[in-house]
Amino acid sequence: MSDTEDQYKLGTSFIFPKEVMNDIHIKSDLGRYRMRGFSLFKKIPTWDDLTFMPGTLTRFVIEGYREKCLTKTIIGPEAPIPLELDIPIYITGMSFGALSYEAKTALARGATMAGTATCSGEGGMIPDERRYSSKWFYQCIQSRYGFNPNHLRLADSVEFFIGQGCKVGLGGHLMGQKVTDQVAEMRSLPAGIDQRSPARHPDWLGPDDLALKIEEIREATDGQIPIQLKLGAARVYDDVRMAAKTGCDSIYIDGMEGGTG
């Protein structure tokens, strides 16, 4: 059998290796998605796929190997106080509960060292995460677990969560074994019990209502910091077109690499 024929054997495909096929079979038996954290079994992009574009006509090269490479990224440039990152990468939202206190604070320290931001994730703010983060997103989610307007005003940017790439349209689910007393206190819910976030926000029904909600958040933050919409990658063209009409400062299209809780 040739190499070309062999790559189409069951379980040897790059897109559908054995782990992916087993996952499909398990979900077909269950009739629903699996209750698990972490990423997909499917092959996904890695850090090795990041590419710096070289100069040609649009970025004319003066002298080889001496050109500056600028990685500064500005989120919400039209906001009175835009969020400036030294690199086009930041630590996305992962809740306290899905991650431990040690992990959250370590990521905050690392993000500060790299000149970039971290995000609270759902469930509210850990004071030490905010203290160690020089640049910090506060995430507003469907369930409003842990939401505190005073913490909102401490943020450098607000991330209004509509969906995430690994489970578009499914809301959130934090397993009971991760709901410690501290997590439960932050979310005003009982410890040791599974906690679910609904798939949609309860106080707006569409893009027009969402625009009003964004104005409400903008008023709460004195109109100073950027407001970002987080969308799971689905009908990207249509979703972005509608999101752009809501008056948000930036739009974040989330891939399927995540899935912490």
Predicted feature locations:
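Conserved, well-structured core domains of diverse proteins
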Residues: M1-I89, G93, A98-T112, T116-A117, ...
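Alpha/beta enzyme core
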Residues: R109, R130-Y132, R144-G261
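Hydrophobic/aromatic residues located in beta-strands of well-ordered beta-sheets
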Residues: T118, W136-Y138, I227
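Short linear interaction motifs
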Residues: C140-Q142
